[in-house]
């Protein structure tokens, strides 16, 4: 496991300070944990990977805490990937609670990528399979639905269906 240059780690920490939450009133914090210091956090869960660093997002109880956590962490993951780092969300990972009523919500492992990822085309459903009344006439609606169509989903199931109607897009889960 290769350590990240301290200058680059400082850039990552600076970027964390600039993250734009979806719900600013939903208090959260992100800790960067080095692998040798994981005893402090004691990660447990079904899908753990070994990495030189982990990001632990903890949040206070709030109705939008989970949405906010996902929104903020995805910004950070996209930043790390754009800088050549490999990332992995640790599904069902658990960490010790922080002080001050912050509960761990998301853990992401990251580090220098061992090799450049070779992207193969993702198998995605056709637009006509996701929209109940094709064709989508409104150009803005088409762009929004296309973005959702190519977005990742768990096991690439794409469980969403769309119904554009009266300038709105109704979204249903299958």
Q: Where is each model-derived feature located?
A:
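Acidic, surface-exposed loops and disordered segments
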Residues: 1-174
